[in-house]
Amino acid sequence: MQAVIAIPELAGLVSEQQATDLVMRPVAGVPLLIRTVLTAARAGASDVLLVVPAPMSARPLQKLLGTIPRQEVRVELIQISEFDPQGHSSWIILKRHLKDEFLWLPWNWITTGEFVSQLPLVGIGSVDWSKAAYATVHEVDRESASSALPPRSAGGVAVTSPESAVAAERFLVARSGKVLDGIHTSFNRRLCRPFVTMLSHTSVTPNAVTVGGVLVSILSAIAFTNGTYWWSVLGALLFYVAGLFDEMDGMLARVTFAESPQGTWFEGFADGLSYLLLFGGITIGLHRHYGRLATVMGIALLVGAILALIATSLQRRRATNPDQPNEYLGRFYQLLEKDSGNWISRVVRQVQAFQRRGVMIHYIVLFTAIGALPLVFFLATVGAHLTWIVILYFNRRFFSQSSGVIPTVTKVKEAL
């Protein structure tokens, strides 16, 4: 898919240096023009046609665009005097570079790849050139156009001033969640928004935020080891904060285009480690009250948690492409929905959400506050062992044809 991005004539309004500064204005830590190009790539564009005014020096733009990895998107820069998207003559000049269908993105239009990828196809004569559009040079059948997705709200923010840049950042952070977010996770993300906005203006990486969450999980485990009510409540609250770190690292990665397969695997490993720390701390704390029984139960829980972590990692490798491990949960939900005729799939689809960390942290706090920590301990033990058993079942049911090879020690190490 092709995307067209045009920078208007700015020479008569501002100096060349000021024009360059405008297109390089950082929005949530990413230069404005780079953000527009990467948004097009995230929407599915593999080629970007960048139209710039003839008087504008192309050298700083080429240097800026050179920071984009070639595997992300290919950018072709064309200089045209007085390009006007509303003028038919401008498109005639671009005709030999233009494909029949293309994404139109104003250079200063901040939006999301998800929104752009869902735009309906419209004729070039019906485009609102101040916003993103999916256009074609051919006529569009009115019935098919009317049956397309209805236009939603503005779907973006035009950055024309420092104030609008702040509004654009709020827009991006508010939409940095996932389609599968439920009530619990959406609440968590609302709490995280100001911190994500702040972090986007620093050199802090998503992986650094992940490490911060692990450190808070260590403090949580230490608090649980004391075994008293108030120390346990403190441990639960710290574990909730650690869960917010888990939300923030993904939000920051999506806002700053810092997503990577390695980051997804690292986040998954950190989540598993945080659970092991939590269960270890609770085991030591309950041992002070229940003695050997708590220790035996804790060992069973830790074994189940480790097996569940390994099984989940192996299933993620089977269910997704190597460069898209972040699509694991969505892919797994799709398979469960297709297999809804199977009662096991129906039950797992309903209860699986409670295993997600963004949901779990709420119930850890709740059950700890009402003094039901032993019940959580028991349910977690049963749930951990059911998790790896169910994963093995679904591996055989969904993925046995795609990979009939029994996982080796090397594959287990790679998955972890």
Task: Mark where each language-model region is.
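Membrane-embedded alpha-helical segments that form the functional core of polytopic membrane enzymes
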Residues: 206-262
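Juxtamembrane helix-boundary/capping and inter-helix hinge elements in multi-pass membrane proteins
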Residues: 80-86, 255-262, 289
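Conserved beta-loop-beta/alpha segment of the NTase-like Rossmann-fold superfamily
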Residues: 62-134
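N-terminal glycine-rich phosphate-binding loop and ensuing alpha1 helix
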Residues: 1-57
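Short amphipathic alpha-helical coupling elements at transmembrane boundaries
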Residues: 193-201, 250, 254-257, 264, ...
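Conserved small-residue-rich
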Residues: 177-223
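A feature for the membrane-embedded catalytic helix bundles of lipid/isoprenoid biosynthetic enzymes
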Residues: 129-196, 269-416
